[in-house]
Amino acid sequence: MHGESPIKRRESRKIWVGSVPVGGDAPIAVQSMTNSDTNDVAATVAQINRLEAAGVDIVRVSVPDMDAAEAFGRIKQLVKVPLVADIHFDHRIALRVAELGVDCLRINPGNIGREDRVRAVVDAARDRGIPIRIGVNAGSLEKDLQKKYGEPTPEALVESALRHVEHLQRLNFQDFKVSVKASDVFMAVAAYRLLAKEIVQPLHLGITEAGGLRSGTVKSAVGLGMLLAEGIGDTIRISLAADPVEEVKVGYDILKSLRLRSRGINFIACPSCSRQNFDVVKTMNELEGRLEDLLVPLDVAVIGCVVNGPGEAKEAHIGLTGGTPNLIYIDGKPAQKLTNDNLVNELERLIREKAAEKAEADASVIVRG
């Protein structure tokens, strides 16, 4: 039952991606991206619905050509979550998805083409209240910056970003967010730190091409954790070569660990040892699978023995500490003794009861407020 996060977030301009606020005092938004063929409308809608069920706030969809733009329009009509269209090179695609109701455009003004084309995209965005995301990536820096710096560097990433920022600002457009991504953690962190001092717009955080589920999770947690702990970042995307739903889960787990945002169960569990009185690993696996549907923020401690068990259990909404018999704590107080028989079923029941109680209490506070 930990309190608010001690992190003081960087002040930034608030923009709106559909119904989702980004920046300012808004919660840090969790994003993901579809990896289906955009032209396969049914598959893409199904994936977006799965992402929404997992708690995603914003979904990015690649729109490589005009056929995909038309498919994007059909997808937009079939989902509720705000959609970002990822567009490169052809400004006409951006203009078309703007007509079709896109919630945000992800572009680089530098690869859209001539000034008149950039102006046309910006005018369309302004007229429809559509924000733009400037996305700079170490793998696709401008040739002159590659020549100037010799290789991708934090300074090169920021110089590229500021070029695009100035481009939009010359056109009197301020509703944008910026990312400066790299697959190298130190490069990305340094670039975001530099950029955070230069602009007031919200920052979209990510470690690009982070890797598979395990390695990508670790790299993203390290890199984004460093920045978020410093108050930098308004929206995050965990880039994984895995099911996009896993990106959402990892994103929320990172935010939970820093007490920046809560959704669902925050498990505190020991790695287990020979002192355990029940199978901690098996118990955790079963509970995580069974309780994925719960959205109410709860701290649940699952500790296998009495060394650290009582201390952790007392700090959680519900805690289980191993013993003979095992002991359940509710709101920091011993409440019930349990044997290993039916342990998971009983613990699930208690957690669901506590979640319902907390949801009702939270709703009551909102109504009274």
Curated annotation (Swiss-Prot):
Keyword flag Protein biosynthesis: no
- Which keywords annotate this record? 4Fe-4S, Iron, Iron-sulfur, Isoprene biosynthesis, Metal-binding, Oxidoreductase
User: Could you tell me the Gene Ontology terms of the biological process aspect for this record?
Assistant: isopentenyl diphosphate biosynthetic process, methylerythritol 4-phosphate pathway; terpenoid biosynthetic process
Enzymatic reactions:
(2E)-4-hydroxy-3-methylbut-2-enyl diphosphate + oxidized [flavodoxin] + H2O + 2 H(+) = 2-C-methyl-D-erythritol 2,4-cyclic diphosphate + reduced [flavodoxin]
Q: In which pathway does it act?
A: Isoprenoid biosynthesis; isopentenyl diphosphate biosynthesis via DXP pathway; isopentenyl diphosphate from 1-deoxy-D-xylulose 5-phosphate: step 5/6
- The EC number(s) given in the record are 1.17.7.3
- List required co-factors: [4Fe-4S] cluster
Q: Where does this protein hold [4Fe-4S] cluster?
A: 270, 273, 305, 312
Molecular-function annotations in GO: 4 iron, 4 sulfur cluster binding; 4-hydroxy-3-methylbut-2-en-1-yl diphosphate synthase activity (ferredoxin); 4-hydroxy-3-methylbut-2-enyl-diphosphate synthase activity (flavodoxin); iron ion binding
Q: How does the cofactor bind to this protein, according to its record?
A: Binds 1 [4Fe-4S] cluster.
Q: Does the keyword Nucleus apply?
A: no
Name one matching Pfam family: GcpE
Q: Which InterPro entries match?
A: Dihydropteroate_synth-like_sf (IPR011005), IspG_bac (IPR016425), IspG_bac-typ (IPR004588), NO2/SO3_Rdtase_4Fe4S_sf (IPR045854)
Q: Known HAMAP family for this protein?
A: IspG
Q: What does this protein do?
A: Converts 2C-methyl-D-erythritol 2,4-cyclodiphosphate (ME-2,4cPP) into 1-hydroxy-2-methyl-2-(E)-butenyl 4-diphosphate.
Family statement: Belongs to the IspG family.
- Name of the protein described by the UniProt record: 4-hydroxy-3-methylbut-2-en-1-yl diphosphate synthase (flavodoxin)
The organism encoding this protein is: Pseudomonas syringae pv. syringae (strain B728a)
Q: What is the lineage of its organism?
A: Bacteria, Pseudomonadati, Pseudomonadota, Gammaproteobacteria, Pseudomonadales
